[in-house]
Amino acid sequence: GLSGSGKSTIAVELEKMLNEAGKAVYLLDGDNIRCGINSDLGFSDEDRNENIRRIGEIAALFRDAGIITLVSFISPFREMRRVARERAGEGNFVEVYVNTDLQTCMERDPKGLYKKQIKNFTGKDSGYEEPLVPELIADTKKYTAKECAEQIFDYIMM
């Protein structure tokens, strides 16, 4: 989903639920990765692809260690999501589309990103390719973050 759609909020709720269920879990979020390992990347299509590629590699390392990895990022291109799914391996990737319209995201704008003049910002002047067949769709206009997290929790625990 777009910036402000609720991805991070849902992921934090889901992380709590998984921890309470005794699962080893780690949350990779756009904020902590963009400020660290991917701080050298901008927002060009090439940099966005590299951002998601690196995240996919990191998530695979966590998976190899037996840790459930929650990945909360703007992933604007279907092809990169396909590559990340492939890298994760069969049965190890659940795509959740946090479907929130642009206007709502702009109204929420918790980080003030829509107000900034960021070149190639997803949803503003750079496109977002909606998933064609995600495993789950989280509608944050209709449901709370906790309700969305519960839906995801139920799906991955079945």
Model segments located where?
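ATP-dependent NMP and nucleoside kinases share a basic, alpha-helical "lid"
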Residues: 24, 36-42, 59-116, 120-121
